Amino acid sequence: MALSSESSAASAARRPSGGPATSWRQVLARLTGGDDLARGQAAWAMDQIMTGEASPAQIAAFAVAMQVKVPTSAEVIELAEVMLNHALPFPAGAIRDDTVDIVGTGGDGVNTLNLSTMAAIVAAAAGVPVVKHGNRAASSLSGGADTLEELGVRIDLGPEQVARSVAEVGIGFCFAPLFHPSYRHTSAVRREIGVPTVFNLLGPLTNPARPRAGLIGCAFAELAEVMAGVFAARRSSVLVVHGDDGLDELTTTTTSTIWRVQAGTVDRLTFDPAGFGFPRAELDDLLGGDAQTNAAEVRAVLAGGQGPVRDAVVLNAAGAIVAHAGLSSRAEWLPAWEDGLARASAAIDSGAAEQLLARWVRFGQQL
């Protein structure tokens, strides 16, 4: 099938709200010509994908052409909003408006431990309400969902149950395939393409609980500012982070770049954990394994184990606490970090993080 062909009458040219008449020929011609899409065209394309009307060839061409052109924040905003509109909704008011997500794009090519998952548990134990969005492994041996499942956490809960989990335990988990069933149309294409595309950005941008704060890891330094622009448009309080060693986390092996999003603005900063007393780690210190191996590491850290993994977990949990503090216009950068690091360390040392994980497991067992 030629890329400009339409597979059905339903895929014929349509006029997105407020935008130009659109077809795959027009969308792909603009992208392959190196031009940004007109307003509404990215939304049109994503709706075609989410409703199953786009062919695999059209999905692949769109993903690759958008990546080569380099997506803009405006385009990614449209893609993410359409995806959220197709997601399972939460009941109005079910999730409090100061929740935090801790998640990364993946795709850094390094099989690290599930640092964001551990950091989410620690941040929740420090008193920050967490609603984490995640999935099974794509490029690593064990994704956050795989590790949580191995720990005994239920990952198959729907919106009402996740909202209860956040309210009663302090943390909840939105399993991406359950909340985004329409996104399945991209799965085979993404696997077959085998290289990162704009779709890698969408997971952290489409938490169906719509948290207002987050520590968001981006493995692609050139696209981190695009993600930050999306969060700025939402007026979220977010730290978009890229380890200068390539990790989609705050790293302890070197410095990280942070795009601090607050009150609709974006500031780019270089962050050195050595300034807070963290010793330099080696990347090998942070490597993970399968779900069983990673779950054992979670238990060891939450039980009070010392070393580079704990350091990385405390650092990332503190980053989430800082992002949460940023929901207040009174938050100051260095004091917020000092507070976040102290609270994250105390959550482990007091046993609060270990106890929270046990409560989370029991919550799922009792449903």
From Swiss-Prot:
Claim: Glycosyltransferase is one of the keywords in the record: yes
GO cellular component, one term: cytosol
GO molecular function term, any single one: magnesium ion binding
Cofactor(s) recorded in Swiss-Prot or TrEMBL: Mg(2+)
Binding, Mg(2+) 1: 116, 249
Binding annotation for Mg(2+) 2: 248-249
Location of the region described as Disordered in the Swiss-Prot/TrEMBL record: 1-24
Cofactor binding notes: Binds 2 magnesium ions per monomer.
Catalysed reactions listed for this entry: N-(5-phospho-beta-D-ribosyl)anthranilate + diphosphate = 5-phospho-alpha-D-ribose 1-diphosphate + anthranilate
Binding site residues for anthranilate 2: 190
Pathway: Amino-acid biosynthesis; L-tryptophan biosynthesis; L-tryptophan from chorismate: step 2/5
Similarity field: Belongs to the anthranilate phosphoribosyltransferase family.
Assembly notes: Homodimer.
Protein's recorded name: Anthranilate phosphoribosyltransferase
Species of provenance: Mycolicibacterium paratuberculosis (strain ATCC BAA-968 / K-10)
